[in-house]
Amino acid sequence: MDIDADKLYWIYKKLFTIRFFEERIKKIAVEKSVPGYLHTCIGSEAICVGVMSALDSDDWISSTYRNHGHSIAKNCELKEITSEIYGRRTGICKGRGGSMHISDFDKGMLGSFGIVAAGPPVVLGAALQEKINGGTKMSATFIGDGAIHNGAFHEAAGLAKLWDVPMLFVCENNAYAEATATDWHLNTKELKDISKAYDMISYQGDGNNVFEVSQITRDAIIESKAKSTPIFLEFKNYRFSGQYEGDTQLYQPCLLYTSPSPRDS
């Protein structure tokens, strides 16, 4: 894919910033100097940055409780994100949301949700209003592999196809739904096959390859807008941290835990 120098610099800067930020947050979590749970996205940076590099800056997105990377890639202010994690009034949500609930409507960040699969219905609403009002903004909702078992996801997917709205369901398949391996909770060979139930177009890609993520997302956006239809994207990757900071990860086989390192973005 052709990427100009400015975009390449933006991609590198965002990848580096997210990793540095999360490693620092991880250290802070060990020191127990912030309230509440912290969920880092170390290992998922390529998905955050790749998808956001394909979206316009004012497009709509929603995130999950593992939202720091999405927020940074969406150009939310680092100082405001950090203040929010500390519960300060200067935080992006005035300190009321904490780590799991980052939002900034001015940047197109409709919200990060501590409840699994709470984002798809919200982004569906954004996509529907764009269609009704003749808008051109794209709408994308980030979910994890565990979210596909939640009713809210299926309701949003069904209505998105019924109403033919252009939006993206971006699934970060990081091999574990909390402590449950994908092979133990998924009854299809490939996670993206879930979309067949809704006659939805789907793509699959390497979540550790930022350029592949970006290209697949660009192609999906073009197709989604041209056909006025939702599209399901599955990006396979691996989270190097636990489900939350403090998770001992005893449920993970050593082979799985160490093998992704050479593919680390």
Label the model's feature ranges:
Residues 66, 172-175, 207-208, 236-238:
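Short, ordered loop/turn segments at secondary-structure junctions
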Residues 257-265:
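Single conserved hydrophobic/aromatic residue that forms the stacking wall/gate
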